[in-house]
């Protein structure tokens, strides 16, 4: 059975103090949130321990935004699975388009990170999606299928979330039409061996469009960027109708 998962991706936002201030607004607004919705905050490394401590016993889980495939080593600036486990996280974003675009992430390194996450009992959120140029060239399916084929080698699809994030819709205010997002996510599902994998939509998800997005039958959740930074706004997304 497919699970619903709403995840906020804070990216490089929020100090520890700002993260805890967010919780004061956010948590009281979840009292009536349906129990079948997993709520996840994917936060900067420096806030993970504080968030985990303050969310203990709540319905909100904590996620990281990256993981290295080695447990230790000379990898300046990276973070490993054992380090993440120590902070109390349960999820980790892997292969976000910003990592692919700005930090040289490839399908091969994405695959290594996915397997590292699973080896440490973390649930990875694999991001896939096409650029504007690729969509205009009718290459959406080709690009995404290649990302899936190369990224999922040796990956356990029973411990996995996938987020479809059309790159042209991330942080731009442009949202993929909900019907088109539903179509692409259906295609993604058709390429999986486990058809019960939770597949999210990401890309300018906001309080004023989340209801329409989540009404689509193939969409199991959302990976939310800018709209996850304000407690009241993200609560509205989590509490979609």
UniProtKB/Swiss-Prot annotation:
Gene3D superfamilies: Aldolase class I. GO terms for molecular function: triose-phosphate isomerase activity. The lineage of its organism: Bacteria, Bacillati, Cyanobacteriota, Cyanophyceae, Acaryochloridales. This is Triosephosphate isomerase. It comes from Acaryochloris marina (strain MBIC 11017). Pathway: Carbohydrate biosynthesis; gluconeogenesis; Carbohydrate degradation; glycolysis; D-glyceraldehyde 3-phosphate from glycerone phosphate: step 1/1. It is found in: Cytoplasm. The active site is at residues 96, 165. One of its GO terms (biological process) is glycerol catabolic process. Its EC number is 5.3.1.1. Substrate binds at residues 9-11, 171, 204, 225-226. Belongs to the triosephosphate isomerase family.
């Amino acid at each position: 059975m497919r699970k619903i998962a709403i995840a906020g991706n804070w990216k490089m936002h929020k100090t520890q103090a700002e993260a805890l201030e967010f919780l004061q607004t956010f948590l009281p607004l979840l009292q009536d949130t349906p129990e079948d919705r997993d709520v996840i905050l994917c936060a900067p490394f420096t806030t993970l321990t504080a968030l985990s401590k303050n969310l203990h016993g709540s319905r909100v889980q904590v996620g990281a935004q990256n993981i290295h495939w080695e447990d230790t080593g000379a990898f300046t600036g990276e973070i490993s699975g054992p380090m993440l486990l120590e902070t109390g996280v349960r999820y980790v974003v892997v292969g976000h388009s910003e990592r692919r675009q700005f930090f040289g992430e490839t399908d091969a390194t994405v695959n290594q990170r996915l397997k590292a996450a699973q080896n440490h009992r973390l649930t990875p959120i694999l991001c896939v999606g096409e650029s504007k140029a690729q969509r205009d060239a009718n290459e959406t399916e080709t690009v995404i299928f290649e990302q899936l084929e190369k990224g999922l080698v040796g990956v356990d699809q029973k411990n996995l979330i996938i987020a479809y994030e059309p790159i042209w819709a991330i942080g731009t205010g442009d949202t993929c039409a909900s019907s088109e997002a539903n179509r692409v996510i259906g295609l993604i599902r058709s390429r999986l061996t486990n058809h019960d994998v939770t597949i999210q939509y990401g890309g300018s998800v906001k309080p004023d469009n989340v209801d329409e997005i989540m009404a689509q039958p193939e969409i199991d959740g959302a990976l939310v960027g800018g709209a996850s930074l304000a407690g009241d706004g993200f609560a509205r997304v989590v509490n979609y109708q």
